[in-house]
Regions:
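Long, internal scaffold/assembly segments composed of regular secondary structure
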Residues: 197-283
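Bacterial Sec-dependent N-terminal signal peptides
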Residues: 1-22
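Low-complexity, Pro/Ser/Thr- and charge-rich linker/hinge segments at domain boundaries
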Residues: 24, 157-180, 385-408
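Aromatic-rich carbohydrate-binding modules that target alpha-glucans
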Residues: 91-116, 212-219, 224, 311-359, ...
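Contiguous beta-strand segments within globular domains
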Residues: 28-76, 177-189, 299-314
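Short acidic/polar inter-strand loop motif in beta-rich domains
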Residues: 77-79, 125, 139-150, 211-212, ...
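Basic K/R-rich, polyanion-interacting modules in nucleoproteins and related proteins
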Residues: 272-321, 405-414
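Ligand-binding face of N-terminal immunoglobulin V-set domains in extracellular IgSF glycoproteins
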Residues: 110-140
Length: 414
């Protein structure tokens, strides 16, 4: 038993800085990339082996057909390619030269585009191993492979039956005097079905609202017993509670819908002004989607190829901050890029951003990136323990005979 405690304790001394499941777009033609497990667009892109497919959707902002092929790679818990695996270890069928065949041109839209859809598994390839996956999409008509890379998309596949049991609870009772602004995540993990003999065999990732910028990797448990771990009062699992995500719904080009202040046509684009986001000194419950988005219009028919694109204008009323202010959501793919950075207007004391976006429902928040790279909440957005945050826990395991990490447990607390 003492040896087990030593192994488990060593496990949680290991730290990782490269962990991140992030989609990445390399070509400006690609817009509205969405990766969904089954029909659950409100959660992480997760599915269990042999169950619901992973859906990858995106738009190419032309009406020209492009021959897009894809390659699937298995990744370890740290999102490095599982170099020790052969393709046949994790995939049955074909990989690398298969073409995305589900293609639709937009109909009667101001900006023409072509919508592409891919489901994994499909008739050409089926996944046979749990874990992390990365898909790379190429334009086969490009002059070389580097120029042909359009984007990468990531998702997770769990075991058909979980090999661990997770129990999650969020509470405002914390170990430090911040009960009004923070949440303590408590966890219990039953790993009695696993044989753990080395600290590198188990890896645990904790996410708040699907964010990887504040992910907690391998938090050290405060209670250990045979086959079980427990995190009850762990400082690493105390999160800023923040505030409810903001949201808007752009469904109609003629009439403002939820959260839209005005819609104008300038002769070439629809200019859509989201209502000004004012400071929030008090908590008010509002059911939002924690950064998720859903493409649709008022007709809600053939959304993939009938929705319009428009220039969406965001305005945040706030004092000038010591760091750069960014829009953050699933649809920014967790990336702090210049296009998501807001500009400050000293005259009006407001931040502004304009993004080219497709009709639909969007939820979002504002985050601040400091000069040294840390990410913080904006004081004007509020920080309240009552906030309905979502927590996800991923449990990876590598048996002694395995050559990569498998995803043996997944938990979500809403």
């Amino acid at each position: 038993m003492k040896q087990l405690y030593t192994i488990i304790s060593l496990l949680f001394l290991f730290t990782h800085t490269a962990w991140a499941q992030q989609h990445e777009i390399f070509n400006q033609r690609i817009r509205t990339l969405q990766v969904v497990g089954g029909t659950n667009w409100l959660s992480l892109p997760v599915s269990s082996l042999g169950s619901e497919p992973i859906h990858i959707d995106f738009d190419d902002m032309t009406h020209d057909y492009h021959r897009y092929s894809y390659k699937i790679e298995h990744c370890d818990a740290n999102w490095n390619v599982s170099a020790s695996l052969f393709e046949s270890d994790y995939l049955r069928g074909f990989n690398g030269n298969q073409i995305i065949e589900d293609v639709e041109q937009s109909i009667n839209t101001n900006h023409p585009y072509t919508h592409y859809h891919l489901a994994i598994p499909n008739a050409d390839c089926q996944l046979t191993m749990s874990g992390n996956y990365r898909l790379t999409v190429y334009d086969d008509n490009a002059e070389n492979e580097e120029e042909g890379i359009m984007f990468t998309a990531c998702w997770m596949i769990t075991e058909p039956q979980p090999l661990v049991k997770l129990k999650l609870e969020a509470t405002s009772t914390t170990d430090i005097d911040i009960q009004k602004t923070h949440q303590q995540l408590k966890m219990e993990l039953d790993h009695s079905q696993l044989r753990i003999t080395h600290p590198n065999q188990l890896n645990i990732v904790v996410l708040q609202n699907g964010r990887w910028d504040n992910a907690v990797i391998n938090p050290k448990p405060d209670y250990l017993s045979a086959g079980k771990m427990s995190w009850q009062h762990v400082r690493a699992l105390i999160f800023d509670a923040g505030n409810e995500y903001r949201k808007f719904e752009f469904l109609d080009t003629d009439h403002p819908t939820m959260g839209i202040d005005a819609i104008d046509w300038d002769g070439s684009d629809y200019q859509v002004k989201v209502m000004t986001d004012n400071p929030r000194p008090n908590y008010v419950y509002d059911e939002a989607a924690k950064g998720s988005f859903y493409i649709r219009n008022s007709d809600n028919v053939e959304n993939n190829n009938t929705c319009e694109y428009a220039q969406i204008h965001f305005t945040l009323k706030a004092p000038k901050q010591p760091g750069d202010v960014y829009l953050n959501a699933d649809w920014t793919y967790g990336r702090f890029l210049p296009e998501y950075r807001m500009e400050y207007d000293e005259m009006t004391k407001t931040y502004h951003a304009r993004l080219f976006m497709k009709q639909g429902y969007y939820s979002y928040q504002y985050l601040m990136k400091m000069e040294e790279g840390s990410i913080r909440l904006l004081p004007s957005e509020g920080n309240f323990y009552q906030t309905q945050n979502k927590y996800n826990v991923l449990v990876y395991y590598r048996a002694q005979s395995d050559r990569t990490d498998r995803l043996v447990g997944y938990g979500e607390l809403k």
